[in-house]
């Protein structure tokens, strides 16, 4: 009997095999190098199917588990035609063959599913979750601490240069003293110093009972400071402009605060920020970021969606972690409606006392000539405009000050200092917040918010609790992306099979 005779007609592997048979898999496998000696190669298409089915069936499957399943599991035997590649073979195939084409495979599988299921891509439910990296917990490198150490080292180098210049005053050689130094300059200075004094490192003395010469001490310090400065430069370079930390074990991982604090001390852990966009329960777009904040992940995720599907979703729905001035402007520029909550959304919509508080600047009435007045009738006048730090669209805040707060009967409720009250206002952002409230408080907005909770947060719930994928296994951003794409493909195929099974049961 054939293996398929032992399988139910609705078995996941048969659904998977029929679906994958409609996709041209050979085009992803053209870059496999040819070999002319040794044993015959395993069929690359069968290998690809086996790997993808492993992630569909298990949520996450290791290389050794793949090897074992091919020996004992009828479904994997069916896909591999009774062959059982070793875990090393699977490792080479995943890391070398699939690494460059996995995103294209994810996109093509999605397009086939979406075409079959008539998935609505105009409504995209967005959420993010921090997955702990495969890195040691106490392996942190902090960018600010490194910069402080580097500046302290600059001071030590300056002191050393002053001593050396005093020593070399009779030779005519002089080292330039600056506020900052480069490792290359210190290495060059060490070479010049060694040349002037004809230093031979083989003659250096070490240990107790030996007294180092001034030349040996200065030369060793130059070499030590150059190596230390080179180390600091490398650490800051690894962090880059957008990160404040990284792990020594996995340089791509950033230290973040994650919800699952099993250490119980509110400690930061090395992690990746995984972002997903869900459409009709399928992962339409996925991205892995090193940013701690979800706000910074929204625009890269939307651009990735556009690159894949050729348009932006009309209704991107997200929680309060995504609502920012930059993201709202991006939505306006690309024809997307504003359905992302902002930080104070819940308080604005549920706390009537806060929303209608007459002492909030946004509730101050505007009188003749556009002059803002407080509850006591005093005028507020524009003092200056201030650029908001880190805003790429040139957002400005207007700073207003009350003309006179002396003797005000509402002073205790209105202000905290003895000076005239000062308020900061961005009318454009306030108008955006009002638009978001109107959108999300409408009937359509309420339905979209409910669906986001079910679909976006539900996807991570299925991943972590039903399919037991709670932690990143690979190291390095490229390998982590490969892993997350495989998990996402497996999730979508798993969802597709379940929906097909329900349709068959209802027929």
Each language-model region and where it sits:
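Basic, short loop/linker segments at the boundary and entry of helix-turn-helix/winged-helix-like folds
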Residues: 9-49, 55, 427
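Secretory-pathway/luminal and periplasmic proteins that interact with or process carbohydrate-rich
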Residues: 75-81
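A Lys/Arg-rich helix-loop hairpin that forms a DNA/phosphate-binding surface
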Residues: 39, 81-82
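A general alpha-helix detector
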Residues: 2, 46-52, 89
């Amino acid at each position: 009997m054939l293996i398929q005779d032992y399988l139910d007609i609705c078995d996941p592997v048969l659904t998977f095999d029929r679906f994958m048979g409609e996709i041209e898999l050979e085009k992803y496998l053209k870059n496999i190098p040819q070999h002319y000696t040794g044993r015959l190669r395993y069929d690359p298409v069968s290998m690809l199917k086996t790997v993808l089915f492993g992630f569909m069936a298990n949520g996450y499957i290791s290389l050794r588990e793949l090897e074992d399943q091919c020996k004992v599991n009828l479904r994997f035997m069916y896909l591999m035609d009774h062959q059982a590649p070793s875990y090393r073979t699977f490792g080479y195939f995943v890391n070398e063959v699939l690494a460059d084409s996995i995103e294209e495979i994810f996109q093509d599988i999605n397009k086939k599913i979406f075409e079959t299921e008539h998935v609505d891509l105009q409504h995209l439910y967005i959420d993010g979750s921090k997955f702990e990296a495969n890195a040691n917990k106490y392996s942190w490198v902090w960018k600010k601490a490194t910069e402080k150490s580097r500046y302290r080292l600059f001071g030590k180098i300056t002191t050393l240069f002053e001593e050396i210049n005093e020593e070399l005053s009779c030779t005519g050689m002089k080292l330039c003293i600056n506020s900052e130094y480069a490792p290359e300059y210190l290495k060059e200075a060490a070479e010049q110093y060694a040349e002037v004094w004809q230093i031979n490192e083989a003659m250096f003395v070490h240990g107790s009972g030996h007294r180092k010469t001034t030349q040996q001490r200065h030369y060793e310090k130059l070499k030590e400071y150059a190596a230390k400065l080179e180390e600091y430069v490398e650490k800051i370079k690894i962090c880059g402009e957008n990160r404040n930390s990284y792990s020594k074990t996995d340089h791509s991982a950033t230290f973040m605060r994650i919800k699952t604090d099993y250490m119980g001390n509110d400690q930061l852990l090395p992690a990746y920020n995984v972002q997903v966009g869900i459409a009709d329960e399928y992962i339409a777009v996925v991205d892995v970021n090193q940013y701690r904040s979800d706000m910074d992940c929204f625009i890269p995720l939307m651009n990735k969606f556009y690159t894949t599907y050729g348009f932006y979703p009309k209704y991107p729905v997200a929680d309060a972690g995504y609502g920012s001035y930059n993201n709202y402007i991006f939505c306006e520029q690309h024809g997307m409606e504003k359905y992302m909550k902002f930080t104070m959304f819940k308080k604005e919509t549920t706390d009537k006392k806060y929303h209608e508080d007459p002492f909030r600047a946004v509730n101050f009435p505007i009188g003749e000539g556009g002059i803002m007045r407080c509850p006591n009738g005093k005028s507020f006048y524009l003092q200056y405009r201030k650029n908001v730090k880190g805003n790429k669209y040139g957002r400005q805040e207007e700073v207003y000050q009350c003309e006179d707060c002396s003797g005000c009967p509402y002073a205790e409720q209105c202000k905290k200092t003895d000076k005239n009250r000062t308020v900061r206002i961005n009318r454009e952002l306030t108008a955006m917040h009002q638009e978001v409230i109107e959108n999300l408080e409408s009937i359509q907005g309420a339905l979209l918010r409910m669906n986001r909770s079910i679909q976006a947060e539900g996807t991570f719930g299925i991943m972590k609790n039903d399919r037991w994928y709670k932690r990143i296994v690979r190291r390095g951003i490229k390998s982590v992306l490969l892993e997350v794409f495989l998990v996402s493909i497996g999730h979508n195929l798993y969802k597709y099979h379940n929906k097909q099974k329900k349709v068959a049961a209802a027929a």
